[in-house]
C-alpha cells in the first residue's frame, strides 16, 4: 500500500482544483452540525448545495459511526464520494477520530476503490495535530488491510481471490503541516511494518515459527537494517548458568535460542533501552498440562518476542536517535520423560533458587534469566513484554495492557505513549506485601503465588531480578491476540513501545 501527503486549500478547491482530481473515492468528514467547513464546504459549493440538502433532508447528519457513499457526483473528479460522520465537534476525541477512520474503511471495503483521496487528516482530533492524524491514519489503514494468508499463501492450497483493497492513499493536509505530515506518514508506515512482522510471527503455526525461525528473523532484520545480532545456543546458555531458562527447555526437541539484536542510533556512550520479549513458541504447560480446548492458541505465547522484534524493526526504519537492544529468550514448553516436574528446584543465572510449583508458569522462568543477562548493558531502562498471565485478562479484559513499574516516571511515560498511540495500558500494583505470596519452604521463592492477584505476583517474581536498573513489565496476555472468528495476532504493543521510544529520542 502506497501513501502520499498533499497540501490542499479547500477554499480554492473549485471544479478545476482539488475536487477535479481523479481517484476512485474522495473521503470527506462531516461534523454533526448544520455548519459546513473545509472539504465538506468545498464539496457543497461544487455540487450546488448537495451536502447541505442531504443534511437538511436527514439522509446524512454526521453522527459518529455513520457514512454515506455517493457515486458519480457532478463537479467531482472522483468516481465516488464517501461522507463520514465525525459526531459533535466538541466531542471529537482521539477515539472518535479512530472510529471515523474505521467507519470509512468499513464502507470502502464494500467497494472496488483502490486509489483514494483521504481528507480526514485535515480534521485531527481535539488536542492533536496533523502529524498525529496522519501517523494514526496510516497505521489504522494498514492494520485494517492486513491479510495473513495473502502474505503467506503457502499455508492454503485454495484461497479466495479478493482482488480488492486500497492500493494508493493520498492524505490531504494544510500547507503549514505539509513537512511534518510527510515525516509522520513515513513513521506510520514504519510502525505498520513492525506490526505486520509481529502479527506474521504470532499467526504462523508453531511447527514453522520455532525458536530457530525467530533467530533467523532477527538475523534478517539485522541484515536489512545493518544491525548487530548475536544468537546463543544451548551450550552458551548452559555456560551462562541460565538454570531457569534451561528448565523450561528440557521437554522439547527444539533447540533453545537466546537472541540479542542491537540498534545503535544514539551516541556510543548513551545507555540503551532494552526490550526483553518472552518467546515461548508453543506452550503446552509442560507436565502441568493445559486443557486441550484452545491449546492451539498457545502458538501466540511468543507474541512478546514478536513485538520487541517488530518494534526494533520500526525503530530501525525510522532511524531514531537512541540505542535500543532487543533480547529474546525463546524455546518450547513441552512435556516429556525428561521435562521439568512440579516441585523441582533450579538455580537462576542470578544465583537465586526457584521452586517450580507449576510448569505452566514458565514465561517468568525464561524471562528472569534474560533480565539478569541484560545487566551487562548498563541500561537506561528495561521493559519486558510477555503474554504472562491469564489473570491479567480477568483484571483488564482485552482493552488495556497491564503495566507494572517501580518508577512513576517510567510508568507514566509508557502510559502516555499508550494513550498517544491508541494502544492503551493500565498501571497495576507492585506493593511489597505481594512478595509474601511467593515464599517457598524449599527455595528462595516459588514460581507462583496462588490464584489471588496472580498477574501481580508474576510481576513481583520478575521484580526480584531487576534491582540494578529501571524496569517495567508489560503483560500483554489480553491484548496480543484475538480469539473467535477474528482469531489472530493484533501487533500490540508495537505502537505503544514505538511511541515510547520516539518520545524518548525526541
Swiss-Prot record:
Its keywords, alphabetically, are: Aminopeptidase, Cytoplasm, Hydrolase, Manganese, Metal-binding, Protease
The UniProt note on the cofactor reads as follows:
Binds 2 manganese ions per subunit.
Q: Which GO terms describe its cellular component?
A: cytoplasm
Which residues are the active-site ones?
290, 364
Superkingdom in the source lineage: Bacteria
Residues bound to Mn(2+) 2 are: 278, 283, 301, 362
Do you know which InterPro entries this protein is assigned to? Leucine_aapep/pepB, Macro_dom-like, Peptidase_M17_C, Peptidase_M17_leu_NH2_pept, Peptidase_M17_N
**Which molecular-function annotation in GO is an example for this chain?**
metalloaminopeptidase activity
Cofactors: Mn(2+)
What biological function has been recorded for the protein in this entry?
Presumably involved in the processing and regular turnover of intracellular proteins. Catalyzes the removal of unsubstituted N-terminal amino acids from various peptides.
Protein's recorded name: Probable cytosol aminopeptidase
Q: Which organism is it from?
A: Ralstonia nicotianae (strain ATCC BAA-1114 / GMI1000) (Ralstonia solanacearum)
Task: Show the taxonomic lineage.
Answer: Bacteria, Pseudomonadati, Pseudomonadota, Betaproteobacteria, Burkholderiales
Q: Which gene encodes it?
A: pepA
